[in-house]
Amino acid sequence: MDIKKAKFVTSMASYGKFAGIGLPQIAVAGKSNVGKSSLINALCRHNKLAKTSATPGKTRLLNVFEINGGTGDAFHLIDLPGYGFAKVDKGEKLRWGQMMQGYFDNSRELRIVLQLVDIRHDPTQDDIDMVSFLRASGIPFQIVCTKADKISRGSRMKYTAAIGRALQAQPWELICCSSETGEGRDQLIRCIGEAIKMPVEFIDEDELTDEELPEEE
């Protein structure tokens, strides 16, 4: 599988308003400014598909993209709003939590979450909480280390080992990516291709609230 075409579908503050057509969903999650929009653009080879911003925390909606529409490899890519951005009021934090919980509670087509972390930094408590939530809920996820071009290959193992320890994953289970160089794109495409063929029985709806989502700081 490869991504041949992509288009923006809608932005929404509530997942319940999205009248999907039953396509598999791939969600992209991560801390504000981790590079979600840049990664989506690199995956789709479309520099202006997802809007990037120098202001962390600007994306406050669920953004939906249709990938490979009209083909056997069609799916929806869901860009989840970033977490962990400090400069928001309590009302905004509450809306973020409700939006995210609403998505995970109501999405029947979610196949996998691409959980992004910045390879240069140790995972935050929010990252750890997010991975714990996904793991406890039985939702498949793939940890993706962004901005891999910012560190030397010789020192990469040190950084991935630290991320693996924090998130209870082996370093070789991580995918290192760079939106600048295209590194890791083929691995992610294979991961997505396998995920969209998966059944959805893995999600136990009774477990979705056992672990709390990270708080929007």
Predicted regions and their residues:
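Helical mechanochemical/support elements of P-loop NTPase systems and associated helical scaffolds
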Residues: 22, 48, 61, 73-76, ...
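Flexible beta-alpha connector loops of hexameric P-loop NTPases
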Residues: 83-93, 120, 149-152
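Canonical P-loop GTPase G-domain recognition
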Residues: 3-16, 150-205
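Conserved G1/Walker A P-loop phosphate-binding module
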Residues: 1-87, 202, 210-216
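Residue-level signal for inorganic ion chemistry
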Residues: 65, 146, 188
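Conserved C-terminal guanine-recognition region of P-loop GTPase G domains, centered on the G4
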Residues: 98-172
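Hydrophobic aliphatic residues
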Residues: 43-47, 104, 167, 192
